[in-house]
Amino acid sequence: MISPNVETFIGCDSSYRAADIVLYGAPFDSTTSYRPGARFGPSAIRHESFGLETYSPYQNADLTDFDIFDSGDLELCFGSSEAALADIEARAAEILHDGKLPLLLGGEHLVTLGAVRAVAEKYPGLHIIHFDAHADLRDDYLGAKLSHACVLRRCHEIVGDGHIHQFCIRSGERAEFEFAAQHTEMHKFDFTGLAELTEQLCATKEPVYLTIDLDCLDPSASPAPVPPRPAA
């Protein structure tokens, strides 16, 4: 379970056997448009984490209070999106089989599909909470069904209507917003409704997958995502 290219995230000092949470990276950006580089995300996130503290005064919690294991990055095929997704799915399925929670670092947003496939197989009735500037609901992008611009559309094919909850969305084609009006729960521009949704899902104990694209943040706070979208 340990990849050879490990620079661990700060505070992830547990062994795999003892861990409740297993972090792993998917350094993949083969369908990225506008500007490549998301494949360097997992290693960069780990490296920069050592400039932080493990304790959060906002949460009054410390990463060292939790049993987290960082298993490093997958070695993914850059020539085949489906092969890369299969590897991501297999690792998530292995972690779930061992009774642990997978935590995935990307990588472009398409990597989410591999993990969602595994989690939805383990937990029927899965809900997806999605933070993003973009709807990611295109049926295809430049003829490709497996694209960062289509990932939530492919996820919808797995979890179905009413199980995708989107926040901060402020960019996409008209057709994506029309699709969302019929099939997803979209909250445009901000996080309005998130607290109520979280309370509802916790009360009913339904399974949840959280996926975060950093461009949900305003470029003033996070300028590097591709492409950046203002007015967050």
Regions found by a protein language model. Give the residues of each.
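Conserved alpha-helical scaffold segments that buttress catalytic/binding sites
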Residues: 1-232
